[in-house]
Amino acid sequence: AVAVDKYTALCEEAISNLALKSATRKTNLIYRVELKTLTSDLMEHRGHGGFFYEYSLKNWEELFSVVTEKFQTVTCFGVDKEAFCEAVVAARLRGIDRIVPVGKAMDIGVFWDGHDLVRELSRIVKAN
């Protein structure tokens, strides 16, 4: 069912998404959709089960112009993560909480999407 869903999503994108540049798939496991441009409706396009959207940035500002509070984790490849993090902080972007390598977006730790999970999921009982 997931393979059919991915193929259906690819066909729908080919029909309706003017920003679509190309699509690649070697098997039904992974579909890669390359975008020509980043658009303001970027967060409405979500891949599932091995359906990925890709875009090669020319500069940070290109991404920053479409970032909203709905962004949480940005996966990247071939960039200096520290420089990118500094640029995110300098631009005062609300929405990018984690910058991780491709393949690490679902790794969870004590801090997740800008939240200290231990603190937020803990309860303190105090007796006076």
Mark where each language-model region is:
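A C-terminal functional module that forms or caps the active site or interfaces directly
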Residues: 78
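NAD(P)-dependent aldehyde/semialdehyde dehydrogenase
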Residues: 1-72, 85-94, 99-126
